[in-house]
């Protein structure tokens, strides 16, 4: 399976296969990558998705533009590089289990120096870079670490409501 994903889906690029599981019902943040991410739901899950094109010039994003999508157990979906997303949500208060396929090295610690968030502002997209191939915009209620850019405007969406 991994070899097929590397050869066909990712055009001979090495990939890493991991998982995300737990109990979540809130948006909390959005991230994006410069490459597609494959999600395969082992349990029913909800993905909250938005479009990178809707991020404002100051790198803020209006959460009312997000849409919720049910991913039934056993279903695989491609989350395009132009899609804002974050951790899946469970359905009806249940936990979720989702396998995640990304290019090798994605989400690894950064090795170089990058622009920092200054006085709550991201002066360039580089200030959003939180890990290798991972740009992140947080919500004030999302619990992200200090230094993260808090640029989600509006409600911290909750699929349990």
Q: Language-model segments: which ranges?
A:
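Active-site region of the double-stranded beta-helix
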Residues: 1-73, 86-161
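Tight coil/turn sites that cap or link beta-strands
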Residues: 73-76, 82
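Short amphipathic alpha-helical surface patches that serve as generic macromolecular interface elements
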Residues: 80-81, 95
């Amino acid at each position: 399976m991994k070899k097929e994903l590397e050869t066909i889906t990712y055009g001979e690029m090495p990939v890493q296969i991991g998982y995300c599981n737990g109990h979540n019902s809130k948006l909390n943040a959005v991230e994006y990558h410069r490459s597609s991410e494959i999600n395969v739901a082992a349990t029913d899950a909800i993905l909250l998705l938005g479009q990178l094109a809707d991020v404002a010039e100051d790198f803020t994003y209006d959460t009312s533009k997000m849409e919720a999508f049910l991913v039934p157990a056993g279903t695989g979906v491609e989350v395009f590089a132009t899609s804002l997303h974050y951790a899946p949500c469970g359905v009806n208060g249940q936990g979720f289990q989702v396998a995640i396929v990304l290019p090798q090295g994605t989400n690894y610690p950064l090795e170089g120096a990058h622009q920092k968030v200054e006085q709550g502002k991201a002066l360039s997209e580089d200030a959003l870079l939180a890990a290798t191939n991972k740009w992140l915009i947080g919500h004030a209620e999302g619990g992200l670490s200090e230094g993260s850019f808090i640029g989600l405007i509006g409600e911290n969406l909750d699929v349990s409501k």
